[in-house]
Amino acid sequence: MKYLSPNKLSLAISLLTLAGSAAYASAEDTTGSDDSHAVIEEVVATASPIRDSQEAAVEAKRNADNTVDVISADTIGRFPDQNLADSLGRLPGLAIERDQGQARYINFRGAPFRYTKIAIDGIDVPGAENGRTPRFDSFPSAITSKLEANKAIMPNMPGEAVAGYINIRTFDPFSREGWTAAADLGKGKQELGDGDISKYSLRTSWSGERFGFVAFTSHNEREQITDNREYDLEKDASGDLIVNKLDFRSYKITREDTAWGGRLEYRGDDIVQRAYFSTLYSEFIDHEERNQFVFDFTAPVSGTSAEDQAVSVSRYLEYGKYENSTRTHTLGADLVAGAWLVTPSVTLTRTDYNMFIPILLSAGTGTTADYDLGDIEDPELYLADDLSSLTYPVTYGLPYTQALENEETKFKLDAQRDISLFGQPSLLSLGLQYDNRNADGHVATYAMQNLTGLFDLDRYNTGERWDSNTTNTIGGTYYDNKGVRDAWEATGTLHNSYAETDKISVDEKVTAAYAMATTEMAWGNLSFGARIEQTDYRSEGYMDVDGSLQKVTGEDTFTHVLPSVHLNADIRDDLKFRISATTGISRPNYEEWRAAVVVSPTEGTVTGGNPDLKAEESMGMDTSLEWYFAPGSLLSAGAFYRAIDNVIYADGQSVDAGRYDPAYAGVEWTYNGYVNGSDGMFQGVEFNFMGTAADLLPSPFDGFGLSANAAFINSHFKDIHGAHHDLPGTSDSIYNASVFYERYGFSARVNYMYRDQWVSPIEDPSEVWGEQKRVDFSMSYELPYSAAGETSSVYFNANNLTNETDNRYAGNGTINQSESYGRSYLAGIRVNY
């Protein structure tokens, strides 16, 4: 059992007492239902898609019982977004982390990825990558009707949502009567490498008096070149640059995401108010070709330029694939039981993550070279010999592999009823949830193979020079990497293998219950309650002691009480004040929690997982002042704070060797893996403006609008040695700004995104990504005619207009990675019927 501090405990007791009072007061049944408890329905934007969808988002935020930001369907459709990460990155305090230029993860208010929980139609799902981290590149925008980014967490939300809880709303078949259909078809180009971009989506629905269904599918694909340079640099005593290594890479990638799903629903007016079955499948696949040459200087010298330097040369070739998927099926109902509305559901979810990157490393050759790093993002390296003429005496196979399969069964029961509490109309909500998760896989690993002489790699050199934003002074050329992989497979030596000590096997059961009451006052409302979560987990694996395998297990049971309170006060009809106090937890991911380790008694080291890790615990506050000065308009300021204990990160720690081998009890060994730090926190302020010129300027200038937001954040935690570091994902400043014009069926928007530098990954807290910015443009025109009652529009999107280069920096302040991707353009047509 986890015991809370006295302050936390007193707050928990007081809130649970109030929730108990609410349950007792349930006998004082009130008649009718307050409209403030109604679910906000999707608003379908047509004539003014940007303005109308902005108004829907503002109204959803205004009527919420907690701090939340919303993106409506048409906002997603009109933004030039590839996936949900792009969409969420436009909200206040949310920042995108990219992979090869494309949005993948979300840092919610500067917090690590794991502090954000994702749900589909209110049913939370595990992260595909490691059981915790949500990846948003596998969820295309086209299947989504609404995004809800909850910033202050309520008891009916998972306790793991330390920073935020993102709910993806899919489409409701009863939002429109009869048959409907929506189609989107787009084609485009990636400027660097002239890669093709394609997208399509199709959605259809039908609803009658009792029955309805919706079905949808979506597919997006893009071919891209990533122009990459990596560095190993340091500085001498006088501050001059020393070049140890230069790494030139060109990636050819094809990324595709596919989704399909639907919902079958019945609506009644007796005991069964609603019964439904929903299903969703989404996947992301990244096909990657690597062409890489590494130049290691034999005797590094000081200076940004030098001549006739001896270098060893290595070549890396690869054709591999990353893929992750989520499939979820839910059967649920809304039932009336007296004064109660009871909502049971059962959900089956499976997530898969697989990586297989077979790399061929050729080494053992060298030459001399001149270099000039005057432009650090475009290093110039001139070789004395033609790169393609170099011969490599040895070739090694490095098949990198990683996998995780996670199956979850979830039982959920929610119940609510109207009551009178403190003489005021209130809504009492109670709930139970049981999650049974089974995760199996292995961590990222490889086994080196000597493949010298098995095949001639030079015959696969196409002679085609790299597509590059930089100057490619080495004369890099593309290899037929697919042919190389076929040749490797033909030798019978390409295997997807891993050691027993790399395995992940975790069984996790989480049992939760909550009680919550929302009381309506003349001045606003008060929502309060608590959630209790009990975690039972067991991790199995093998301990390798100098080559001898022993089966090991780790298990524990712990309980957390997570109270929260939310006050929403209407100072005026157009002015709202909010303040919330919340608590939460973040459990270790499955790689961190695995029991498997490698032990070397001779070296006194242990490497691997840590099943004794504690869950991270949080307590914090949110407050905001929101001025709704016109329809679809908002000016707000907010602040937030989270205290985090038991921060999980990678480090080396002294341990008693008897923990791993009783014969060595009392001897001190070094454990290298995952440990708990302390004294973590993140805090910040947010500002948000959304407005239009509709009431300020005459036609046609009344079509202009502006949205802008900014967040200023800081964070830190203390490691086991007493040093302080930023939490991964924290940018000191995040900005977003959009200017749009919308009149006469024409819509256009320019969007700017910026985030300051941030730590990533947590395995090296000294390494940071440099500041990043993006400028995107979108426009659409609604066609003024219709053949059969449909509404059609044509659109054009342009992304990364300023052709940005993204940089990463080592702990010594020198650059260690620079990559660019070029602009992209997409044109298409949307038809709604």
Where are the regions a protein language model picked out?
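Outer-membrane beta-barrel signature, preferentially recognizing the C-terminal barrel domain
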Residues: 309-328, 498-511, 556, 585-644, ...
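Short acidic/polar hinge/loop motifs at secondary-structure boundaries
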Residues: 123-151, 202
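Extracytoplasmic beta-strand/coil segments of soluble accessory domains associated
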Residues: 85-124
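C-terminal beta-signal and adjacent terminal beta-strands/loops
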Residues: 645, 704, 756-760, 781-833
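N-terminal periplasmic accessory domains that precede
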Residues: 84-87, 104-107, 119, 134-135, ...
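N-terminal periplasmic "start-of-domain" segments of outer-membrane beta-barrel proteins
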Residues: 44-77, 105, 113, 123
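Transmembrane beta-barrel wall of Gram-negative outer-membrane proteins
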Residues: 192-295, 314, 318-340, 563-565, ...
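Gram-negative outer-membrane beta-barrel transporters
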Residues: 641-643, 654-655, 660-759, 805
